[in-house]
């Protein structure tokens, strides 16, 4: 799972640059989207930080706005799940633990971003780095067991590629059927 942490290289709307990489210290579920409460899955897709929790049982935590618009369409309608966080410690069921030092750094960066007036803090969650031989092997292994993953990951790939190419957060929309789409360039 990849949670890119980037900041603007300049104060204007210019490109981002990588400032840190945080390993996910524990996972539950398997590759693929979260679709219902209690499935142990970590969501994959395009999200935002929607809350700050300085009182977390896992040191500190940043809330992820799961379910988003796509999830509300494609997930279990009565019980899609929720309360997904990026947090400290090294245990989790459906969240993304990055350790205490990692969450301290990320939490402060997110607070600083919000204090500078940025209301939306995007978090794009991918199953892995979606390029190169490792990705090809990873995708082949998992889609052989679950062909629906190939169709889902095909929705994530254009935004992943756009960010890697342009170093700007791409605009992603949700189609009426819940599929992600890269918005056309303005």
Label the model's feature ranges.
Residues 3-4, 8-46:
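Glycine-rich catalytic cores of cysteine/serine-nucleophile enzymes that process amide/ester linkages
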Residues 38-185:
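Exported/periplasmic cell-wall-interacting domains
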Residues 1-4, 125:
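FKBP-type peptidyl-prolyl cis-trans isomerase
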């Amino acid at each position: 799972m990849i949670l890119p942490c980037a900041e603007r290289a300049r104060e204007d709307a210019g490109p981002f640059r990588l400032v840190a990489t945080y390993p996910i210290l524990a996972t539950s579920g398997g590759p693929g989207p979260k679709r219902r409460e209690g499935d142990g899955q970590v969501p994959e897709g395009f999200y935002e930080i929607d809350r700050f929790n300085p009182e977390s049982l896992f040191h500190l935590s940043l809330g992820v706005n799961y379910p988003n618009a796509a999830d509300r369409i494609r997930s279990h309608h009565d019980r899609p799940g929720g309360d997904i966080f990026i947090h400290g410690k090294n245990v989790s069921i459906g969240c993304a633990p990055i350790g205490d030092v990692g969450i301290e750094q990320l939490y402060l960066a997110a607070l600083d971003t919000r204090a500078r007036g940025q209301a939306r803090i995007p978090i794009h969650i991918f199953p892995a780095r979606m390029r190169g031989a490792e990705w090809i092997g990873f995708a082949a292994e998992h889609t052989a067991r679950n062909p629906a993953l190939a169709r889902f990951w095909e929705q994530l790939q254009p935004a992943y590629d756009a960010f890697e190419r342009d170093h700007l957060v791409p605009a992603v929309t949700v189609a009426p059927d819940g599929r992600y789409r890269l918005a056309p360039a303005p």
